[in-house]
Amino acid sequence: RQQQFEKCLVQTKSFPCRWAPDAGLGYGEPVFNFYGQFPYWIGEIFRILKLSVLDSVKANFILTIVTSSIAIYFLARKFWSNTGATISAIFYAYAPYRAVDIWVRGALPESLAFIFFPLILLFIKEFISTNKNKYLFWLILSLAGLTLTHNLSLLIFAPFAIVWTLFWWWQSNRSKHLIYDLTSAGLASLLLSAFYLLPVIFESSLVTLNQTTSGYYDFHLHYATLRQLFLSTFWGFGGSTWGPNDTMSFAVGHMHWIVAMILVVFVLIKKRNKEILFFISLGLFAIFLTHGKSDFIWNLVKPMAFIQFPWRFLTMSTLFLSLGIGAIYKFIPKILTSVLLCLLLILNVGVFHPDIWRDIS
């Protein structure tokens, strides 16, 4: 896609780019009319710096890991100390699903979306707390960035962002103008990305979108099992198949769910830091949406069919569990915190590699 995006810019000189010239057996397809363009604009920056197309994509993936870790660090810093924020950042970077996105699926847009998730939550929280318009400005840009990066990630993230907003609004003075301002920010972000959204909305009837929600892409066929989510140590470079015999991992992360459950026990016993329960509850609900028991929700909310794969909600479990886990340093000795981080790296760092190393010159 990076190569086709560049070819579209150079050959057609169109802005924004709509057409992938060589797709569709050489006839071309309106790929960038429906897929977010922002990842490929970033890729063009690396191309300007004289990186090859392949190296530009690699650099983009590296950027997603580094920048997303920094983003959640600043979010977690609003709740925990520097130590807690660092813990959250490390858990966010080394969640198994992050490796799936990069090394198994090669899902650049979804990987890039991991940057915007914590930024949006941060700016919502800061605006509600301070009522400063600068946070509203950055919120608009972040929402537009997520929209232009991966519209399915926006669909997945939006309900959680709304719950996040209402929770912190309820904790504040509950001023109605805060809701009005945040709603206006959401609308402004849609206007900012209208050059992409309007064609998606009004030209979808010109393509066969029904094929994206039926057959192999029917979400009913891709629920994860409890074993896959919590117990399995399987790692593969295949894909999501019908039924439980998938050839890729849907693991939440052993350290992620175990530490999260330990935190819940500590919070319930000590009866403090209730926001930890909020973060972990959102993460657990996201995990629930990956499982077949959530089928009634998927059938009720029709637009969810476009998400295709319920395990995509591992993006949200990774986000909120990592955020909550940052508080673990409050309840255990410093040496145990270091042990937990070492265990995380030992268990997960080994999956951050490709299936086959190829020497391409």
Functional labels for PLM-detected ranges:
Residues R1-I360:
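Membrane-embedded transmembrane-helix bundle of lipid-linked glycan/lipid transferases
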